[in-house]
């Protein structure tokens, strides 16, 4: 009988769904699709107004109102406030959560979204018997207290910093494990040689390639940054990914460029693009940084969401895998300096990037989940209380 694995996530940014799908696909590959019944649930979509509009509101908030986002993130990031907000989310949506659980029976529950973790854990814990609950932290370094619930059976984290925050939040060492961040299990297999990737993509074989990414929604000043690099008249080629932002793609296509320039919309061949590139210009999203590290691609971080992505910048810079350049002019100057330093310096940064990666993370996470999928159901909060009272009477 197939094991039922429920993934709790939301499309607030692309990283949560990507992580859930990566783990699901690793389970399919490792244990067979006939043996795994995986369900992805966007919990915000099932929630009451206004939370059900978070997938639409989130990109605007983090891109257009960063100061407000930073204030909210930092004010809520204490043990007490995170718990209070999680309780509020649960009680506001208790009936909807109950229906979600009844409609989607599970042998194991996997949560890949910080805001959902504690509220969902509370929803499952009111059951008489509940499935094991596993949290997979998808923020790289700076992690919110929302992520850490002491009732979860496992909390799988990407870095030592995330592990240390879990300890501070009250989790026990045996509850946590450092695995790295999950990426598509086919990612490594798609990392062909630079020459092969460029031939497949139609890029010039002998010019350094600067890959520019703004995330799936095409957020950030990508056009201005690309123009700043182009106006340097460097001996290189540009590859610019506009994501789902059609207006940005059209603007890029209508712009005259001083170098050979390749323009893309939303892509599904990121491993090939990274394999073909020499330098990546990107925002500090954890999934893209992790993929770049696995690919051995030096990174110039041009933007970061306040709060959860601040630590990502420090992590990359302190490990000498990249640089931080928050203005288009600074990005262009960094690209020029790196190209001037030559191939050996770039190769060292590439080696540093690979050193901070764990390409096996998704397999380790899938194996952990599979083990828990075979675990017996666990007593919920009320049953635990009854068992405790029974033991007290017996003694």
Task: Report each predicted region and the residues it spans.
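Active-site and donor-binding regions of nucleotide-sugar-utilizing enzymes
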Residues: 71-170, 175-178, 184
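C-terminal "capping" alpha-helix adjacent to the active site of nucleotide-linked donor transferases
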Residues: 318-319, 326-344
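C-terminal alpha-helical cap of glycosyltransferases
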Residues: 358-395
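A short, well-ordered alpha-helix in the C-terminal region of glycosyltransferases
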Residues: 344-359
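Conserved N-terminal ligand/cofactor-binding loop architecture of enzyme catalytic domains
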Residues: 22-103
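Donor-nucleotide binding loops and adjacent catalytic segments primarily
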Residues: 194-199, 203-276
